[in-house]
Amino acid sequence: FNSYLITLSNLNSKTIIALKKEGVTGMSVLMPEMKLSKQLANNNVPDYIWVGNKWELYIEGLPSIDWNRLQNFFKNLEIDLLGPQFEGVRILISPEKVMDLAKHPMITYIQQKEAPAIPENKIGIKNHRSNALRVPYAGGRNYDGDGIVVGHGDDGDIQPHIDFSGRVLANKSGPSNGAHGDHVAGTIMGAGNLDPDGEGQAPGSKLVYYDYPDNLNDIDTDYGLYGIRVTASSYSNGCNAGYTSFTRRVDLDAIQHPSLTHVFSAGNNGNSNCNYGAGSGWGNITGGHKQGKNVIATANVTGSDIIAGSSSRGPAHDGRIKPDIAALGTNVFSCLAPNDYRSITGTSMACPGIAGVLAQLYDAYRQNNNGVDPEGGLMRALLTNNADDLGNPGPDFKYGYGRVNGLRAAKAIEMNWFIKDTIAQNETDTIDIPV
């Protein structure tokens, strides 16, 4: 079953009969309280939304809404319009006037502002089978991510490092706030020029570097401008935040930019209770955007494929499988400025491992398909369905579909072991698969 939000200028028995003929099985009026996020509806709001004596909220309206025509309505409720965001606008409003806002027929959704961002922090390339993909000599695959551009959002300016030389297409960040971004960037695309043990997953790939979350906010422009096909974000966005406006935004990116894949860390709250309902240790993925249906959230495993105690567990807020995949995130050896290296642990280090392997797989697809880009949905399917199963049989809430196996995914690309097809309601489609 699918749900839709519709507007009707005239609801009568004739309209209801017509809708039933189209297969509509039920309808309800969108009441004001139904427009509120769970936190607002339960009056369980986080401290960070307070600005003076008002709340900072995000609101959406019907597609036909003209926010400028609501100026008088906003003025009567003493609402401050802060500016556009995603598909709606940000506002400041007194808590007691939120329900009055929700009663407006053009308003469809109201939620608290997004949670503030907090960074999450030679075995990897072997465990991920990344090394087998990029052998450059005769008979090797040579999938090193050449020509693939990764949009990496992190903690401010990455410092000069010999491992990045000539492959940072643009640095759109502000001043440096630490070494987190340097280490993550090295795990994605470090060349290992000074120390081969510090080589990243895709040493042929290129980087566009941002202050997080501008790698997500700017994708509508930079997908075409720089050719970004993979993003990497090792930042939290609230704990078990549910399906937020930011989640919807990154899911829409997959539709509007079909060859794009967003990669996130799952989070480092593995022992936390984030009010999912199963107690400590479950339902603590650190973010709304990580819970998207068209994105990858990455768990942290050790070099012996054991889930790290700190690695956030699923399920998603609505019960879906999260994390999606696991990668080495414990004692990852990577770049540190200036021209240095260090081992760091966290899902922050697992996320770039997946982003780097994806860059290699995009490279593999191009090399085997006359330079054509794959669809992001196919790459996510290849990544998860070719993982090495860990933990409980099948996908689970600790490891997702298992630890990434880049070699197996690349072989599926080379052998064309995938089918794209469509089917309509009540139709039958038969596909023969040789075994």
Task: Specify the residue positions occupied by each region the protein language model found.
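Autoinhibitory N-terminal propeptides
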Residues: 1-150
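Sec-exported extracytoplasmic/periplasmic mature domains
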Residues: 75, 79, 102-106, 189-193, ...
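Subtilisin-like serine protease catalytic core
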Residues: 68, 133-217, 226-229, 240-243, ...
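Catalytic-core environment of secreted peptidases
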Residues: 153-165, 300-352
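C-terminal subdomain of the subtilisin-like protease fold in secreted/lumenal serine endopeptidases
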Residues: 198, 209, 363-434
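Substrate-binding/access-modulating region of protease and related hydrolase catalytic domains
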Residues: 66-69, 96, 191-196, 208-293, ...
